[in-house]
């Protein structure tokens, strides 16, 4: 993560960070080794973990950025008044050179734990549209989207001009620790490109992943489906 922070500092663009991990952090701190089924325990774990997550980001960005926490629910996007307030807050923070760190409000919202957004991939696409972002970069533990042709080794697809049902059907399931996976990233890419946003999926452990993805040298690139107004 320290490497990613340094890369973002060098890129010198305004950016918003959408981060998951509150529940996992909380479970670890509470000494719980399995994902609980009880809703109240999940939400309590999220409350414990979210503060630790923000403390980690404050340390990582110390001397580089002041960070701000925004915990969102689906209502923040479905209500016109709340959505307008969200957009105003995000844009004010960016004008102040403050880094908004966004997560789902897992500690109080039942619908978010049940997947109202689906996962943070969809949330990131919604946030990108809210701030009229030029780029959405989705970092994962693989090098991009791989085409499974049923014969031999899967092939990395460097450019996907349009997300189709066939591409989604080619995806594996959810990730180990979250609700998302490659299918959810494709859906996020579809939503973002429809809003005129460039999208990249890349391996977060790759050296220089941020500038290299922005220059389309690694990962899978999705061009926008329309020109932003």
Report each predicted region and the residues it spans.
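C-terminal catalytic "cap/lid" subdomain
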Residues: 1-229
């Amino acid at each position: 993560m320290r490497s990613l922070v340094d890369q973002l500092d060098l890129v010198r663009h305004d950016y918003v960070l959408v981060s998951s991990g509150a529940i996992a952090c909380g479970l670890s701190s509470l000494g719980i080794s399995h994902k609980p089924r009880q809703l109240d325990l999940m939400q309590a774990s999220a409350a414990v973990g979210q503060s630790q997550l923000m403390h980690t980001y404050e340390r990582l960005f110390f001397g580089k950025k002041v960070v701000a926490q925004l915990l969102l629910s689906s209502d923040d996007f479905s209500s016109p008044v709340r959505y307008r307030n969200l957009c105003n807050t995000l844009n004010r923070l960016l004008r102040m050179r403050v880094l908004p760190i966004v997560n789902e409000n897992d500690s109080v919202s039942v619908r978010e734990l049940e997947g109202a957004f689906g996962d943070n991939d969809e949330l990131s696409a919604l946030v990108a549209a809210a701030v009229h972002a030029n780029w959405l970069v989705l970092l994962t533990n693989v090098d991009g989207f791989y085409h499974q042709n049923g014969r031999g080794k899967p092939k990395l697809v460097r450019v996907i001009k349009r997300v189709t049902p066939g591409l989604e059907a080619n995806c594996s399931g959810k990730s180990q620790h979250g609700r998302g996976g490659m299918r959810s990233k494709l859906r996020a890419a579809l939503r973002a490109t429809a809003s005129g946003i460039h999208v990249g999926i890349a391996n977060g452990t790759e050296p220089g992943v941020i500038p290299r993805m922005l220059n389309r040298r690694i990962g899978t690139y999705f061009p926008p489906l329309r020109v932003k107004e």
